[in-house]
């Protein structure tokens, strides 16, 4: 069976050509799929024989809501979607003055092993298909009734560990006959998969790259982020400099503030040193408590921010949304897995 929603318009055109169908079928079906139909029978401008033929050879992905939490504080909505194979993924809808942002997952689970993150506790199960990435944006918009204007790939999983499917998703969601979300309204976060950063630079995509740094020295970073053993801090920053030189786009560096681990003044000084010659924005993140993690939130966020700014580094503190729900990455999925006896 063919995952028809993972096809681009060009691929659909070839698909229908091979079926002996006219070229305009591609746009028809593409448009229906990106409206969120769950079956071919809903495609009422196709003949019944064609709909039956498609149903025999193709399937349409469509997740169901396993859990849903809405914050009474700020309206943030956390979705736990159940996929066709029973696996669950998380999506978060956040409301800002500049529009609605959806934070999506790129994998079922994660194999990166960051010590302070709930997403990686059960490891990686599988990659998400392009259609399953798209569905998170599409069905969040349909369920909430709120138009989505921005996407961040910062949910469960490492996007650059699922590179081909993520690139296909970007093409799909950017299509003028689909959701038509511009690349400049999309952010992609990586824990530092250097070959993926170089591949993105070569493609000259106009998205915003965010790098989960969390420590500027390899000793600390290797302790909390195993990926650093494959691509150490020096290798990572070299790739970031190459990315800026090729794209001209500023990188955002995510920095979860961990008490006594990465919140020292000398680490702020090291960040400033490594950013020299490259514009960068450091986004300081108040750490979320994870039951299985020994790490605690830093009490020096304000002081660390002031130190960075005194060194000429642009630094902001991320606004925490959904504080009264399981809005941080991996928490709701973990709760579901515990209740299913999978943890």
Where in this protein do the model-derived segments appear?
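Short linear Ser/Thr-Pro motifs
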Residues: 71, 105-106, 119, 189, ...
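Generic beta-strand structural signal
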Residues: 77, 89, 100-104, 112, ...
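Conserved alpha-helical substructure of the radical SAM core
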Residues: 121-150
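Auxiliary Fe-S-binding modules of radical SAM enzymes
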Residues: 1-89, 241-250, 255-343
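Canonical Radical SAM [4Fe-4S] cluster-binding loop centered on the CxxxCxxC motif
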Residues: 95-132
